[in-house]
Amino acid sequence: MVDNSEIRVVVGMSGGVDSSVSALLLKQQGFDVVGVFMKNWDDTDDSGVCTATEDYEDVKKVADEIGIPYYSINFEKDYWERVFEYFLNEYKKGRTPNPDVMCNKEIKFKSFLDFAMDLDADYIAMGHYAATKVDENGIVHMMRPKDGNKDQTYFLSQLSQDQLKKVIFPLANLTKPQVREIAIDAGLATAKKKDSTGICFIGERNFKKFLSEFLPAQSGKMVTPDGKVVGEHAGLMYYTIGQRSGLGLGSTKESTDPWFVVGKDLKKNELIVEQGYDSKLLYATSLDASGVSFFTGQPEHDIDLKCTAKFRYRQPDVGVTMHYHAKDNTVHVEFDEPARAVTPGQAIVFYNGEECLGGATIDRAYQNEKQLQLV
């Protein structure tokens, strides 16, 4: 029988309740646990308060309560070069990126994993809601966790088999309320701390104001699909496909329906808008995606697979047929039913029942083979 005390698990602790409970559970299971706080961003807020300092204080309190050593590591340079510059470049292209997917791939499961290995770790863990299963060949499969509402496999969709083999998910079989209860029963300092929301480097700040500090905005016309000017936009990067709020457009003689963003024309710097939730221009029948990553490894041959997918977080699965092209590591995905507001830059993640297969980045969307003018 394996003695857990000889297995070192380095836990990425954010100062939140989920990673705190992960560390606690691993300690209770007898592992040699080390806590590490990652500082990925200089996150002084508009009032001059650095939330990372507060979070690290919480990590220290919890580590002392559990009885584990702790460290702090600064990944700001890695984060800027591998996540934030990617984020800005995607917005420059008129796309809507998902920095959390890239942060997991490049920082939490690469930079942090490397650092943990330098601490002689056998495994790493964090506070993610996800699960794994090892097959008879030793291949690790990514599985949905017990708490479907907190399922974070979408954000982990770019991890490799090598990364997955080094990860433990202590919260796999717990719901969020159960995690809170464990923290309260153990008297952890973070037991009642509210969850962080939004993109980590923006925090509670105004997104438009934040983005304008790094990218110059270029205002332009808001037009209908047939070219009628109906308003002015503040800069294409501030809008995403399917967006309703913040357009500043009222009802017309023809309709009282709200307006939605249905496309962008980068060459003309025009934002294309149309009235009605069910605008035909919002519905795609297929898409192209690139940078495909499968948890069990990249196939050497083309694959056609009937499965389900999500193209945004917490969205119900939709039926798809995936056509994988091994030569250029891309997929063409056909939807069983037209899909609303497919957004270039976002992740599409594939599932087969309870297993998460992997994901890719959406490049283009089509309606009956005609490319939608989403970017």
Curated annotation (Swiss-Prot):
Residues 150-152, 312-313 are annotated as: Interaction with tRNA. GO terms for biological process: tRNA wobble position uridine thiolation. It is found in: Cytoplasm. Its EC number is 2.8.1.13. The lineage of its organism: Bacteria, Bacillati, Bacillota, Bacilli, Lactobacillales. The active site is at residues 103, 200. Its main location: cytoplasm. It comes from Lactobacillus gasseri (strain ATCC 33323 / DSM 20243 / BCRC 14619 / CIP 102991 / JCM 1131 / KCTC 3163 / NCIMB 11718 / NCTC 13722 / AM63). Residues 98-100 are annotated as: Interaction with target base in tRNA. ATP binds at residues 12-19, 38, 127. The record marks 128, 346 as: Interaction with tRNA. GO terms for cellular component: cytoplasm. Disulfide bonds join 103-200. Catalyzes the 2-thiolation of uridine at the wobble position (U34) of tRNA, leading to the formation of s(2)U34. This is tRNA-specific 2-thiouridylase MnmA. InterPro entries: MnmA-like, MnmA-like_C, MnmA-like_central, MnmA-like_central_sf, Rossmann-like_a/b/a_fold. One of its GO terms (molecular function) is tRNA-uridine 2-sulfurtransferase activity. It comes from the Bacteria. It is an enzyme of class 2 (transferase). Gene3D superfamilies: Adenine nucleotide alpha hydrolases-like domains, HUPs, Translation factors.
